[in-house]
């Protein structure tokens, strides 16, 4: 009788559980525990019931097969289809040759432009350096001649300025009033001995207002050295003054101011277009 009553109590408990959750969720092991005897019912606790419920819930979820996971794996997925073949072009060879020719022309043109720009840059740098730093440059020759004139005592007396004072030196007079825009006239020639000769002419003006014309000749001994052959100062109404005495030519070799101002042109050369007499 005692075992029958125990079985009835277990069935009633199972019915109570079935009201809240279907009996199918209970595992076989938990149902067998209910029917083992009197001591089995008393061993059930709230913790074991919760454990059985969670076990039944997860078992049901895993048995459903919600997603076909094998189709979402890169290892089992089928390979992608191959790309379609390119369309056949009859002019493919011609286009290839035209592309190669165009690239070769572009490369050649770019190379020529780069080489041309490099050569022009080197030439400009050389001209600037030779003009400013080489002893044979016009700028250094002009400055050197002016310093020699300022330190010459005969030039002090003729132009009427004291030692230590500066004189104005510039090219021929013309419409521009700024002296810096009147560069000195110079001509370079190659002599019979194969050396370069520089002829230069410029005007000087002292603080007292007196002025004169300076003519000079310079020879380039080497690439880094040059020498004045003569430096002459001519003033209206005065005799020629030699800042640098000529060594290799007679004093009559220096052109006169009158001949320089005449129609013979600068240093005996006619500049500009030929005019009919």
Swiss-Prot record:
Stretch list, region Disordered: 72-91
Keyword Mitochondrion belongs to the record: yes
Topology within the bilayer: Single-pass membrane protein
Pfam families, alphabetized: TIM21 (PF08294)
Main location as per UniProt: mitochondrion
Mitochondrial intermembrane side: 130-277
GO BP term, pick one: protein import into mitochondrial matrix
Key word Transmembrane present: yes
Regions crossing the membrane: 109-129
Subcellular location: Mitochondrion inner membrane
Superkingdom of origin: Eukaryota
Alphabetical list of InterPro entries matching this protein: Tim21, Tim21_IMS_sf
Assembly with partners or alone: Component of the TIM23 complex, at least composed of TIM23, TIM17, TIM50 and TIM21.
The protein's name: Mitochondrial import inner membrane translocase subunit TIM21
Record gene name: TIM21
